[in-house]
């Protein structure tokens, strides 16, 4: 998945469960993330990470921190709303 497609999909879903293959261990991992940094809670969190051409900066609710994620390693994006049963879209 390319960076633009990834950002468009995650932005459309709001909060999403993103499954990806770890670059270090090769294991499948997941995070509950958002690209919407407008909430006061997220704005109050410190961030030193900088997005580059290969990585996307996300806020992960399950780790309560920002993280850089490489879209090329993503295996699935599921909207959190579909898990909570207030939506039904899946990528």
Residue ranges and their predicted role:
Residues 15, 90-91:
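Intrinsically disordered, low-complexity regulatory segments
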Residues 1-7, 31-45:
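Charged, amphipathic alpha-helical segments
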Residues 1-5, 52, 77-90:
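Ribonuclease/tRNase effector modules and their secretory precursors
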Residues 38-40, 64-83:
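Structured surface patches comprising rigid loops and adjacent beta-strands/short helices at the edges
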Residues 12-22:
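A short, Trp-centered hydrophobic/proline-enriched beta-strand micro-motif
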Residues 8-13, 51:
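Short, 15-30-residue, compositionally biased linear elements
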Residues 36-67:
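Acidic, aromatic-enriched beta-alpha/helix-loop junctions
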